Amino acid sequence: DIYEGTWDEEEIRGKGKLTDKKGNVYIGDFIDQKFSGEKGTLSLINGDIYTGKFINGQAEGLGEYIYKKGDKYIGNFSNNKREGHGIYIWASGDKFEGEFEKSFMKSGKFMYYNGDICEGNYKNEKLDGLGTFDYKNGDKYVGNFLLGKKEGKGIFTFSNGDIYEGNYRNDFKDNGKFIFSNGDIYIGNYKDNKIEGLGEYTYKN
């Protein structure tokens, strides 16, 4: 390792620059020979760069992490992991703002680059449990999700005024009530998102 900076009784302490054997470079404050301070910068050999607070050699507290691939995270860290409130921006333009746990999205709002917005709880980086999905075209879904797919009870409101209220299975309508904007009502089964099987259709007239 190569260190340039201040010393205290033969220990690295104060401001300095440390380049380790792998080529990672840290510039900032040191306490007891470890990265510690309100603002330091760690440039990793893989191209990633972290700037923020360090405690005992780890990212802890507010910071910004820029990935070589173009993604960026701004928010709280704990033990080198994304923890608590933060904003993650993908190189694609997608953006998530909310709570993180052990670097994974836990709850919050996901804004897609195409204008779609979803909000709720997450599991394995996918919507899970109660949530909402607002589509750019004006459609909206409010209901249950299972690993990113509509599953269980939910209400889908179409931009043209149609409303579906019922059950979903694997992201598709399964059984429920469809209220058409013209006043017609269908109650029954579906297959591949289309009316099929047992059901009752009531015409407004």
Tell me the role of every PLM-derived stretch.
Residues D1-N205:
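Glycine/tyrosine- and acidic-biased, solvent-exposed loop/turn segments at the edges of beta-strands
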